[in-house]
Design a protein with these regions (language model features):
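Short, small/polar-rich motifs associated with maturation and membrane association
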Residues: 1-344, 348-363, 405, 432, ...
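Surface-exposed loop/interface segments of Gram-negative outer-membrane beta-barrel transport/assembly proteins
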Residues: 105, 120, 237-290, 330-337, ...
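Active-site phosphate-binding and catalytic loops of NTP-dependent enzymes
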Residues: 154-157, 217, 603-611, 924-928
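Residues on the lipid-exposed face of transmembrane beta-strands in outer-membrane beta-barrel proteins
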Residues: 232, 308-312, 342-348, 433-439, ...
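Repeated loop/turn-to-beta-strand initiation elements of outer-membrane beta-barrel proteins
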Residues: 316-319, 353-356, 444-447, 503, ...
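Conserved C-terminal beta-signal and adjacent last beta-strands/turns
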Residues: 743, 822-850, 897-947, 965-980
Length: 980
């Protein structure tokens, strides 16, 4: 019995010892995980101990895990920064966690070609524009939001028509005739600028502007003009779905309305002075005073948009679903843009070794476009300049004055009535999708295959009604149809590994195939007799048709990239790409492009240790390499013949294109030197210097330079051009207090352009009908024009300078000279500021271009000085020369205005691109609603102010001639953002 009690005592003491020992080597950790966004519990947060063991939080955000003292626990959730805690020595430990959104993580990621990189580890020149700069812009497309945002990126619009896209150039113009726009990549697939308005700006996560060879060379033959990579949104939050609703309502008016045409009183005075009084009843006409700018342009063109998105993620799946509606009236009559769009981005981890996904967009557009760019009495934009102020477009009852009933008293036709009887509309359908699969073949070895599908179908329908008197009882209907199909298949193999956590290697091999097919059809019929039945089938005869107009283009590519990182101090990368294109002949079908880049992270050097407290970034980068340009029409290398030729009454075929099997790629060699510094985590300064040389420039060459064989032009590789420049970008947090912050930003870009070689030793070539000339040693687009010298005060004659600087009254082409001005802006940039106090934010962003010139063709008509006296004229003609001794720059009546330097105007401008005032309701107040996680209201103005010396309706434009241009609009919108 004694032995039994001794045994029991021993067992109990041993058990107590074991329990005591265990209590000293394990800790029960528990707590609640909430979101910093709204303070609500987070479900599904992973709590891991570093050995692969862990738990996830419950529906209420609770967790409980038992680990050893000293264990570091990591709390992680998609869309949030990781949180870490070291478990102390204790029996129990309660630790509540507040998860911070991974805004900084997203900001630290840079999207590059075929991948992403952490900011500060990229040797190339890459500028990133995040979603907050794009999603609230009240425009149909994202392009306008980029103006003034990126150093070296020039964004200009040749029209303010709502559906039109802007023109972009990165670091100047590299080519004379070939394409000068960047390559646009949407979720890995090439798109064109015409597709901009199909993308809802709120669906964009980020845009990366790739500028130098190290960044662009891996895109090869398409990247000489830079690359813009667009990435759409993904689901990120793990605790529950994010539901966002956004709406904007507003109106538009002309952004910059310089209007100096005569009023009725001034017109009557002018007519009396020049003797145009025959048959005029001035007592009656003086009672009518119409400002045709107010008649033609709408100062309250409505704009509305609605967007709804749902996004979320689990440990295996992330998704983003959005639907939107956008409707904008144009400021010019007969123009509007309406868009319905749906996007679904989806990724799922099928297995540890396989992830699959798709990014899909469906889009429908209804477009009406106003005629512009041509001078006619019936097209409203140009007619607004021609109509006399005493021609009233309306009857007394407010209806349109009509040529049908004789109530229209003006010359020709009432442009508003013409527009009503000649409608033109387009409908566009688009499906864009990328399907991809990621295979984790082996540790750090992945293979990705992606297939892109881009299909668009556009139809156009125009009518002219039989009841319209000028049609003499016969109507017209025209239909057009065009289809485009772009298929792209990309395969990449990526292997990444490190040695001793010091040497980091990353290798990429890839293959890409692209096929692009287009076809169009159009038909026109006439003879319709009923306005309501004005269609193709109701005409009595077909007057024109165009069918089977197809075009195909294909490309095959192989590429690779190698990257090396030593201890986060030294970075090196090299890329190589081979492209084969159907646009070139058998002699030069393949092109090879490559680049190298280096970056030195000074901050991580030992000798910079004492500077790290106040210097958060110090990097120097250098890159050099080549990229190509193949943007020419299809089939230009082929010698072609065409049927339908007639010779002495017999039909036959005739040569129409000489062909050139030696046609090859345009090649641009780019070198870039960059300096990137950050101070006190509040001031960042980036300075970059670059030099580009384009050789084998693609140009449609006049064959008279080389031979006379009956052909006018032939595509060939003609010469060389250089672009050199500098860019500086500054971002600063001026003040950062508890409830107040003030941030500023500014960027400046300068580009010098020079033609260094032309065709077959030719030193100069005048471009017909442009008043510009290509000259070796001079910039592209330099004006070649007669110099206006003013007016002879004795007799009112116009004076010009001849080539020898002598005054002359004769205007001769032989006296034209290069005047040193170009329509390509060498200077561009932007600056802005943002003030935030508690939930209130005020931001402003400006954009500008400088030293840019355009010929104002409108003045050729408005200041014709007698040539077009039957149209309304500029009030400046009232100050023309009238008698000996008058000092003025406008000659006497009858001395017509010519295309000379008087029409050449400085089109530099400074524009307040965006001004926004917003208010975010406090999260504490929103918690009471349970459902609403965020609410923001805002008011903003787009293109609010414009400062310029240009006398036209708008200083923006993409070429040397400003002619009857659709002006940019000023927009005022009010918005509401709701987050659930």
């Amino acid at each position: 019995m004694r032995n039994f009690r001794r045994l029991i005592s021993t067992i109990l003491l041993s058990a107590i010892g074991v329990v005591t020992a265990f209590s000293q080597t394990s800790v029960k950790v528990s707590g609640v995980v909430t979101s910093a966004d709204d303070g609500l519990p987070m479900i599904g947060v992973a709590v891991m101990d570093g050995n692969g063991n862990g738990v996830v939080t419950s529906l209420d955000g609770d967790y409980e895990i038992t680990v050893a003292p000293g264990t570091e626990l990591t709390f992680s959730s998609i869309g949030f920064n990781d949180e870490k805690v070291v478990v102390p020595q204790a029996e129990t430990f309660t630790h509540n966690v507040v998860m911070q959104p991974e805004t900084m993580k997203l900001d630290d990621v840079v999207v590059i070609a075929y991948g992403v990189r952490k900011k500060g580890t990229v040797a190339g020149s890459v500028s990133t524009v995040k979603s907050e700069k794009l999603e609230n812009t009240p425009t149909a497309a994202f392009d306008q939001a980029l103006q003034g945002q990126v150093a070296g990126l020039t964004v200009l619009s040749n029209t303010g028509e709502p559906s039109a896209s802007a023109s972009m150039k990165i670091r100047g113009t590299n080519s004379i005739n070939s394409g000068t726009s960047p390559l646009y990549i949407l979720d890995g697939v090439e798109i064109s600028a015409a597709d901009f308005n199909t993308i809802n700006p709120a669906d964009i996560e980020s845009m990366s502007v790739l500028k130098d060879a190290s960044s662009t060379s891996i895109y090869g033959a398409r990247a000489a003009n830079g690359v813009i990579v667009i990435t759409t949104k993904r689901g990120r939050n793990m605790d529950r779905p994010n539901i966002n609703f956004r709406t904007q309502l507003g109106w538009s008016a002309i952004a910059h309305g310089n209007w100096d045409l005569m009023t009725t009183a001034e017109r009557i005075q002018y007519e009396k002075e020049i003797g145009m009084t025959s048959g005029q009843n001035y007592d009656y006409l003086s009672k009518i005073d119409v400002n045709w700018m107010d008649v033609v342009f709408n100062d309250a063109a409505m704009l509305q948009s609605y967007e709804l998105s749902v996004s979320g993620a689990t440990d295996k799946t992330n998704y983003y679903l959005s639907g939107s509606y956008y409707d904008q009236e144009g400021v010019a009559p007969g123009s509007m843009f309406e868009r319905y769009s749906l996007r679904y981005n989806f990724e799922h981890q099928m297995a540890k070794w396989l992830k699959m996904g798709a990014n899909t967009m469906f889009n429908y557009q209804n477009i009406q476009q106003a005629d512009e760019g041509a001078y006619a009495l019936v097209t409203p934009i140009s007619a607004a300049r021609f109509m006399l102020p005493y021609w009233d477009p309306y009857k007394a009852d407010g209806s349109l004055a009509s040529i049908n009933d004789g109530t229209w008293k003006g010359q020709g036709q009432n442009p508003l009535e013409w527009l009503e009887n000649n409608p033109l509309a387009y409908k566009k359908y688009k499906v864009f999708s990328t399907l991809f699969a990621d295979f984790n073949i082996y540790k750090n070895l992945t293979f990705k295959t992606q297939f892109g599908f881009d299909f668009s179908h556009t139809t156009g329908f125009s009518q002219s009604f039989a009841s319209y008197k000028p049609n003499l009882g016969e109507g017209m209907a025209s239909r057009s149809s065009s289809d485009g199909l772009n298929l792209q298949w990309t395969n990449t193999l990526n292997y990444r590994f490190d040695i001793d956590n010091i040497h980091d290697f990353n290798f990429l091999l890839g293959h890409e195939w692209q096929d692009y097919h287009t076809e169009r059809f159009s038909v026109r019929s006439e003879g319709q007799t009923n306005d309501y039945l004005t269609d193709i089938s109701t005409g009595t005869r077909v007057t024109s048709w165009d069918s089977m107009a197809t075009s195909d283009y294909s490309r095959v590519s192989f590429f690779g990239r190698a990257e090396y990182n030593y201890a986060d101090r030294y970075y090196a990368e090299a890329s190589l790409r081979a492209d084969g294109s159907s646009r070139f002949g058998k002699n030069n079908r393949w092109g090879l492009f490559g680049a190298v880049g280096f970056m030195w992270n000074l901050r991580n050097e030992d000798f910079m240790l004492d500077c790290r407290e106040w210097m958060n970034q110090a990097q120097i980068s250098f890159s050099t390499g080549t990229s190509g340009n193949s943007e020419i029409p299809n089939y230009e290398h082929l010698a072609l013949i065409s049927g339908g030729a007639d010779y002495i009454g017999d039909s036959g075929v005739a040569p129409v294109q000489p062909g050139n099997e030696n046609l090859t790629w345009e090649n641009t060699w780019t070198s870039n030197l960059g300096f990137h510094f950050g101070f006190w985590n509040r001031l960042n300064v980036d300075l970059e210097l670059y030099a580009k040389r384009t050789t084998d420039m693609l140009m449609s060459v006049p064959l008279s330079y080389a031979q006379s064989n009956g052909y006018g032009y032939m595509w060939d590789n003609v010469g060389a051009m250089v672009n050199m420049g500098a860019e500086i970008n500054v971002n600063a947090t001026v003040l950062q207090l508890k409830d107040f912050s003030w941030n500023v930003n500014a960027n400046v870009g300068y580009n010098y352009n020079e033609i260094t070689e032309l065709y077959n030793g030719v030193q100069e070539y005048e471009l017909a009908n442009t008043n510009t000339k290509l000259v070796v040693g001079h910039p592209l687009g330099e004006f070649y024009i007669n110099r206006y010298a003013g007016v002879n005060p004795a007799n009112g004659d116009a004076l010009w300078y001849d080539k020898d600087e002598n005054l002359t009254t004769e205007l001769k082409d032989s006296d034209k000279v290069l005047v040193g001005n170009t329509f390509h802006a060498p200077w561009q940039g932007g600056f802005g500021t943002a003030l935030t106090w508690k939930g209130i934010s005020l931001s402003a962003q400006f954009s500008w271009v400088a030293d840019r010139y355009m010929l104002n063709n409108d003045r050729y008509f408005d200041e014709s000085n007698g040539r077009f006296a039957t149209y309304n004229q500029s009030r400046r003609l009232l100050d023309r020369w009238k008698q000996p001794g008058d000092v003025t720059d406008i000659p006497r009546h009858g001395v017509f205005t010519e295309f000379d330097s008087r029409l050449l105007e400085d089109a530099s401008f400074l524009r307040l691109k965006n001004l926004m005032l917003s208010y975010n309701l406090p999260s504490g107040l929103l918690k009471k609603t349970v459902v609403i996680r965020g609410l923001r209201v805002y008011a903003q103005a787009q293109n609010l102010l414009t400062f310029t010396n240009f006398s036209g309706l708008d200083p923006e434009g993409t070429n040397n001639l400003y002619a009857a241009q659709y002006p940019m609009s000023r927009q005022f919108t009010f918005g509401l953002d709701l987050m659930f």
